[in-house]
Amino acid sequence: MAKKSSVEKNNHRKDLVKRFAEKRKALLAIANDESREMEERFEARLKLAELPRNSSATRIRNRCEMTGRPRAYYRKLGISRVALRELGNRGLIPGLVKSSW
């Protein structure tokens, strides 16, 4: 089980990303538009740098919904390998069978 503070920190980052998504997208569009003047693009980069670091989507860590584990995360299911194994052994995931040969 992950520390509650780590999970909460990640949830806070998700909230910040949602809150600043439109502003960040607009500033990036201005900064990357080569048809605009260099000063305008530079000002957009400065405003982008003033945004909180945690408002960038790359700072979000995928975590298991059940345990909060940050590694061995299956994107399709939203859980870690440990949780997947537990649920699979209980027969709670349809179509998942233990392989044997």
UniProtKB/Swiss-Prot annotation:
One of its GO terms (cellular component) is small ribosomal subunit. SUPFAM superfamilies: Glucocorticoid receptor-like (DNA-binding domain) (SSF57716). GO terms for molecular function: rRNA binding; structural constituent of ribosome. It holds the Pfam family Ribosomal_S14. One of its GO terms (biological process) is translation. Gene3D superfamilies: 1.10.287.1480. Keywords: Ribonucleoprotein, Ribosomal protein, RNA-binding, rRNA-binding. Part of the 30S ribosomal subunit. Contacts proteins S3 and S10. HAMAP family: Ribosomal_uS14_1. Belongs to the universal ribosomal protein uS14 family. Binds 16S rRNA, required for the assembly of 30S particles and may also be responsible for determining the conformation of the 16S rRNA at the A site. This is Small ribosomal subunit protein uS14. It comes from Methylorubrum extorquens (strain PA1) (Methylobacterium extorquens).
